[in-house]
Every structure is written in C-alpha cells, then in structure tokens.
C-alpha cells in the first residue's frame, strides 16, 4: 500500500479495476479502497445488491466483461473465481497491466494495521461481525472487511479510524496463509474446498500455517470443541493460542448456563487465563441471535476482547448492537403464521447447525421444520455426498432441488434427485422429496406451512433471491405473505 499511497499523493490518481466487483469479497475491498481515496471501478456479469451499493457511491460499474472496460486502468484485481480466459484478464496481460489477486490486495490493506483474521470452514462471517461489535463497544473504531452484509451497517465493509482491521479470511484457495494478521481465529475445520486442496490433510496443513505464520507477539483463538482444531492446537507449540468451547472443560473460555429463545441466546462465561484475568466468570451475556453455533462464534470474539483488555463491561454488553448478518438465519417473510428463513448453509455441518437451531425454535412453538435445500457445486456434492445423506435429521419435511452449478460442469451421477433417492433408499429420512424446479417450492409452502413452523430455505446459489421474492410469488397465486425484511 505504500507505493499506492505514494502514487495517490504525488501523481495523477490511477484507476484500480475489479473483475467480478459484485462478489462479496471483492466489493468489500473495493469499497475500502474507494473510502481511502483511490479511484475504483469494476465489472460483473449481473447487477446485485453490492454493485448497486457501490454505484450509489459513484463507483463506475460495467455490466458484462469486455476488453474496453479496462481502457484507462493501472491495476486489475481478480479473485480465484475469475476464469483465466476472461477477456479483461487477457487484455490486461496483453497490455502488461499488473494483475493483483484479491487476497494480495487484502494483505496490503492489512499490512500496516493490527489485524484480526477470521477463518474456519463455517461461521467466519458472523464471527467477524461479532468481533467488530466488541471493538466498537471498547471505544475502538476498526476497519472491517467481511464476507457478508452486516445488517446494522448495510454493507460488508467499512472504514474505521483506529489502527485495527478485522477481516474474514477465505481459506478456499490457501491464500489466507499469506495474510499478515496479528490475531488469527479458527472457528472449525471440516472437509471443504477439496476441489482445490485434493485431500483433507492438505487443508489442515494450511490452517496450521495460518497460525504459525503469525508474528511472535500475536496469538491465535481456536475452538477446541472441534476435534480437528483440538488436534491442531495440541500439535502447535511455537505460538500463543487461546482456546474456547462449550463442551471442552479445559478450554480457556467456556460458555455455560445456556438459555435460548426464538431470537436470542443468554449464557455465562468462565475465563481461565492466569496472565490476563485469572479465573473469572461473566454472567448473563446475551447475543441477539439463536443457535449454539452462534454462542461459539461469540466466544471467539470474547477471547479477543479479553486478550486485548477491553474490560468486563465492554465484553458483557458488547453484543447489544449486533443485528446479525444477511443470509445467516435471516427471517425474510411470514406465511400462515410460519416463519420463512433464508440461510447460507451449503455444507453438511452448516446444514446440521442451522436445522438444529430451527428445530429448537419450532419445538417451542409446537411447529415443524420444513427444509428446502439447493445444493451448491457438483464438486462439493461429489466430495461430501455421504455427509449430505446424514445432515437433515432435524427437518420434519425435506425438499432438495437440483444442484446450482456455480460455473461447474455436471458430474455424472451427482444430482439432487440422486441424493434424494439415496437418502430414501437408505432410510436416512422418511420424508425426503425432490423438487424439479425451485419455483415448485411455492406450492410446498402453500401445502405445508402451519402456525409455528420454520421454513428453512438453504443454499449458496439463487435460492436466496427466490426466498426474498416469495411475497410476490405467493401473491400471484392469490395468497397473502408478509415480508419481514
């Protein structure tokens, strides 16, 4: 960033172009650079919430990728999701315009800051938001670059005035190990992104490097309720590690006396850190979001706050302003007194956590859980097919659509229908159904929804757009639906 800063100060402002600027990771970095005073523009195939937000700031957005989009740019930023045959990449190579990976640009933003990097197979986005909440409660004003829209900010990234930067660290292509973080959080490690890593051990090795690459004065925060994370922590001696959990009695930070309701969770925390607070109990911490997994996410934030000496008051009250993250158990509508939830869960472990939360709420309301799941990527389904057969136990009624390709080519035998057939044949669920078209979900809701039910629409594809359009879809059939967000 020093070279960019020099150019921004002493020369004509040069333009940074983002290919795929509407992506949640790319849009956040673009917004931060824009707020720092750089000239930013970008392109994407379709308009979305992120492109509209950036355009409202005055950032030039091109719809579609074309050589002429980069006529007057000095740098091009890409993510690993961009095809090397993209015409803008080819043009940049032809004109010898520097091409910068998204992770490298993030690293430059973090280099001169005290940075907190949040990684793990699941829970990164919510944990990043919760960490930011505690920093703000402590009177600090961090820069935040998140992997999801923070509801009370209406953005996934915002510029702060302090020397702290909190970022979600994407592990999908191993670039996260090069991020110059001071504090590293690992929420969990599950088999994911095996199309890149090829095997689970290589993925675990990347998380090991994520910790060991920390400076000697930094520290890691790890959830040892997760057995793979526990083993990793046990094997690392060269860096300071603060542990947390619910079931792990030897963790430095433990949640207990847990009470949950439809919209929140309350718990006590036991802290056992001799060099910080000694053994201390903080009572009645409340997070305004349900779910055991979210309690674990909050413990990661609490661990950071304790190590940085935020104080008991900030830690106890720090989550009061947390309003959640879009697509993380987001209630989007009500139909026939049933709640319709939009959730990003697309991995078996995420699905289990989401449905467990829904089941707990439905039981208290004498309702049932209706799960509508859109699988995401053929490669993920292929690698985790057996795990997908076992992850829907908390759904009373299950519907699975075909796979959202996300740019991948089909794989023979890997389909949503095949998954339903295997689940049914092996009797893992007695009410599993295949939805040939996502639009058929409207009929599912009309036929099944009753008072107290939780209708969970899950996936990383276009099922979210569908969930947010339900009011119009139901109205077109003569049914009334109340939109919540």
Swiss-Prot record:
Which residues of the sequence carry a binding annotation for ATP? 120-126
- Pathway stated in the Swiss-Prot or TrEMBL entry: Cell wall biogenesis; peptidoglycan biosynthesis
Q: What is its EC number?
A: 6.3.2.8
- Recorded name of the encoding gene: murC
Q: Does the keyword Nucleotide-binding apply?
A: yes
Which reactions does this protein catalyse? UDP-N-acetyl-alpha-D-muramate + L-alanine + ATP = UDP-N-acetyl-alpha-D-muramoyl-L-alanine + ADP + phosphate + H(+)
Keywords carried by this UniProt record: ATP-binding, Cell cycle, Cell division, Cell shape, Cell wall biogenesis/degradation, Cytoplasm, Ligase, Nucleotide-binding, Peptidoglycan synthesis
Q: Please report the organism this UniProt entry assigns to the protein.
A: Rickettsia africae (strain ESF-5)
At the top of the EC hierarchy, this enzyme's class is ligase
Output the superkingdom of the source species. Bacteria
Pfam families found in the cross-reference section: Mur_ligase (PF01225), Mur_ligase_C (PF02875), Mur_ligase_M (PF08245)
Q: Where in the cell is it found?
A: Cytoplasm
NCBIfam families, per database record: murC
Which Gene Ontology BP terms does the record give?
A: cell division; cell wall organization; peptidoglycan biosynthetic process; regulation of cell shape
* SUPFAM superfamilies referenced in this protein's UniProt entry, alphabetically: MurCD N-terminal domain, MurD-like peptide ligases, catalytic domain, MurD-like peptide ligases, peptide-binding domain
Q: Could you say which protein family the record assigns here?
A: Belongs to the MurCDEF family.
**Purpose of the protein:** Cell wall formation.
Q: What is this protein called?
A: UDP-N-acetylmuramate--L-alanine ligase
Source species taxonomy: Bacteria, Pseudomonadati, Pseudomonadota, Alphaproteobacteria, Rickettsiales
């Amino acid at each position: 960033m020093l070279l960019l800063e020099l150019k921004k100060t002493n020369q004509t402002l040069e333009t940074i172009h983002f290919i795929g600027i509407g992506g949640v990771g790319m849009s956040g970095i673009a917004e931060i650079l824009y707020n720092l005073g750089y000239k930013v523009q970008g392109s994407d195939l379709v308009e979305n919430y992120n492109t509209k937000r950036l355009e409202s700031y005055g950032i030039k957005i091109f719809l579609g990728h074309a050589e002429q989009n980069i006529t007057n740019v000095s740098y091009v930023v890409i993510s690993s999701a961009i095809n090397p045959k993209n015409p803008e990449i080819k043009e940049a190579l032809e004109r010898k315009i520097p091409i910068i990976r998204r992770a490298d640009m993030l690293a430059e933003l973090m280099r001169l800051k005290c940075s907190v990097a949040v990684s793990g197979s699941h829970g990164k986005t919510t944990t990043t938001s919760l960490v930011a909440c505690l920093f703000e409660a402590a009177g600090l004003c961090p820069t935040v670059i998140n992997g999801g829209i923070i509801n009370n900010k209406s953005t996934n990234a915002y510029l702060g005035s302090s020397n702290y930067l909190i970022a979600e660290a994407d592990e999908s292509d191993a670039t996260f190990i090069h991020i110059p973080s001071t504090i590293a959080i690992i929420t969990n490690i599950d088999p994911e992104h095996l199309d890149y890593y090829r095997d689970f051990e290589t993925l675990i090795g990347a998380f090991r490097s994520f910790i060991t690459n920390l400076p000697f004065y930094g520290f890691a925060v790890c959830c040892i309720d997760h057995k793979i994370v526990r083993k990793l922590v046990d094997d690392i001696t060269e860096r300071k590690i603060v542990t947390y959990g619910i079931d792990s009695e030897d963790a430095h930070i433990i949640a207990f006396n847990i009470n949950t309701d439809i919209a929140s969770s309350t718990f006590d925390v036991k802290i056992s850190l001799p060099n910080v607070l000694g053994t201390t109990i903080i009572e009645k911490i409340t997070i305004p979001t349900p779910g055991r997994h979210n309690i674990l996410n909050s413990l990661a934030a609490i661990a950071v706050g304790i190590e940085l000496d935020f104080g008991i008051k900030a830690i106890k009250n720090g989550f009061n302003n947390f309003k959640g993250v879009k697509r993380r158990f987001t209630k989007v509508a009500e139909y026939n007194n049933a709640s319709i939830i939009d959730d990003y869960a697309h991995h078996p472990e995420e699905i289990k956590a989401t449905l467990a939360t829904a089941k707990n709420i439905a039981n208290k309301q004498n309702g049932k859980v209706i799960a509508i799941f859109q699988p995401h990527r053929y490669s993920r389904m292929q690698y985790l097919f057996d795990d997908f057969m076992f992850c829907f136990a908390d759904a009373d009624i299950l519907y699975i659509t075909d796979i959202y390709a996300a740019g991948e080519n089909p794989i023979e035998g890997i389909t949503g229908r095949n998954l339903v057939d295997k689940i049914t044949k092996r009797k893992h669920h007695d009410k599993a159904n295949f939805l040939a078209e996502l639009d058929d979900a409207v009929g599912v809701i009309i036929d099944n929804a009753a008072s107290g039910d939780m209708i969970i629409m899950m996936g990383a594809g276009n099922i979210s757009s569908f969930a947010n359009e339900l009011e119009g879809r139901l109205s077109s059939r003569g049914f009334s639906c109340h939109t919540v967000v």
